[in-house]
């Protein structure tokens, strides 16, 4: 449920996260144990995953499905319960704040020629392209179909890590995919909220959404800007080992401020990350390793819970038209719109094809789907189910094809990838 307003209200579009550990009738400990075990396995196999089709993201999704009611029934999680909504709320805020720090004004200017096309042309075309089959094949009305298009328009490079996470992949391709995925989460949010209010048929909600977005924008600029300017005073110096905690403190204060004032925390998070990276690149640089780890942890936790929500009962009622929407969104609509946006660009054909294919539906879509489910719109369950199967299909396809595509691009694995072999540099030869 939403933290403010009546049930189903859009007033305060954040997600309730209190007492989530006890959600699901005492299954919290089992869920945490499962997360720890899968995290240990995925870290231990991360070197192998970097070289093969093995996907750590897919591990968490599959593990969630196994422990959920569609598997062994070890956990029973409600999609609208505080566990799901709280974890999604914190995780998306963390991811957007971290992604925003990769989108400083200098970085945007440097890569804007390509990423601007992806965001300004491919993204709106993807929204509209998904809305068409959602209306004609899945039977959604136009506002709800456009809502689905907005929910599924963001991308997530975590499911294509062999492409965006390797230094030997062409920089312009990595930058294009990183900037696109870093910005489209935040850019999709206003469209999601507007179409959500329209689908509810309550025009008065549009004004409230506008106020929330405006407050989020204001806090996202003001709070990190004031802190960054204060840090320029000679008396305010941090020990090197603590410098990563400065941006984290900004994020925590911003998160609490947004929840207290009804500002939209997701837009605020992304804008704050970008503002901090623009005004204090050193602070953003020190925070990057910590931010990446926090983002990965929260994403993996959300994927585990999301996998537990995907049960046979939830997907068995989907029609052939519903499945067609998911398949078309991944195999046709995203690739076609991206290729169209990259026409007459300096990218070689192989890199354009890779950029077109790697538009995985990821974490932001999970949270936006939950927003639709909790908002009380007539087709909320239908929208969430469509989002769920599309994301699951995307994770399977994209996270298992990133390494083969990298090899097709003739990109050799870098020498510093972990192999499991022990170094003998300090030993005497036998």
What would you call each of these model-derived segments?
Residues 2-430:
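Transmembrane helical cores of multi-pass secondary ion antiporters/exchangers
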């Amino acid at each position: 449920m939403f933290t403010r307003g009546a049930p189903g209200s859009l007033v305060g579009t954040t997600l309730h996260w209190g007492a989530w550990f006890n959600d699901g009738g005492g299954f919290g400990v089992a869920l945490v144990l499962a997360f720890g075990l899968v995290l240990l396995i995925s870290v231990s196999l991360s070197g192998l995953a970097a070289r093969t089709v093995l996907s750590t993201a897919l591990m968490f999704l599959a593990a969630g499905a196994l422990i959920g009611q569609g598997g062994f029934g070890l956990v029973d999680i409600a999609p609208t319960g505080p566990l799901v909504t709280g974890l999604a709320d914190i995780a998306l805020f963390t991811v957007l704040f971290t992604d925003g720090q990769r989108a400083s004004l200098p970085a945007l200017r440097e890569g804007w020629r390509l990423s601007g096309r992806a965001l300004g042309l491919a993204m709106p075309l993807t929204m509209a392209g998904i809305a068409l089959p959602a209306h004609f094949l899945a039977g959604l009305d136009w506002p709800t179909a456009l809502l689905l298009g907005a929910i599924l328009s963001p991308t997530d490079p975590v499911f294509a890590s062999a492409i965006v996470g390797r230094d030997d992949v062409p920089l312009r391709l990595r930058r294009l995919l990183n900037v696109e995925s870093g910005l489209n989460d935040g850019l999709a949010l206003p469209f999601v909220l507007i179409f959500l209010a329209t689908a509810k048929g309550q025009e008065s909600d549009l004004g409230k959404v506008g106020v929330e977005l405006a407050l989020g924008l204001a806090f996202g600029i003001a709070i990190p800007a004031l802190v960054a300017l204060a840090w320029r005073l000679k008396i305010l110096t941090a020990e090197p080992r603590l410098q990563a905690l400065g941006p984290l403190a900004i994020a925590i204060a911003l998160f609490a401020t947004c929840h207290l004032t009804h500002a939209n925390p997701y837009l605020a998070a992304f804008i704050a990350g970008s503002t901090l990276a623009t005004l204090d690149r050193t602070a953003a640089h020190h925070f990057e390793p910590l931010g990446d780890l926090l983002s990965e942890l929260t994403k993996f936790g959300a994927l585990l819970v999301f996998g537990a929500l995907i049960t046979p009962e939830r997907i068995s009622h989907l029609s052939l038209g519903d499945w067609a929407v998911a398949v078309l969104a991944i195999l046709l609509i995203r690739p076609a719109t991206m290729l169209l946006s990259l026409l007459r660009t300096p990218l070689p054909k192989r890199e354009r094809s890779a950029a077109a294919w790697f538009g995985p539906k990821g974490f932001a879509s999970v949270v936006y789907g939950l927003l639709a489910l909790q908002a009380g719109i007539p087709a909320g369950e239908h929208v969430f189910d469509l989002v769920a199967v599309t994301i699951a299909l995307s994770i399977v396809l994209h996270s298992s094809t990133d390494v083969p595509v990298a090899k097709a691009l003739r990109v050799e694995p870098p020498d510093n990838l972990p192999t499991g072999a022990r170094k003998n540099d300090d030993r005497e030869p036998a």
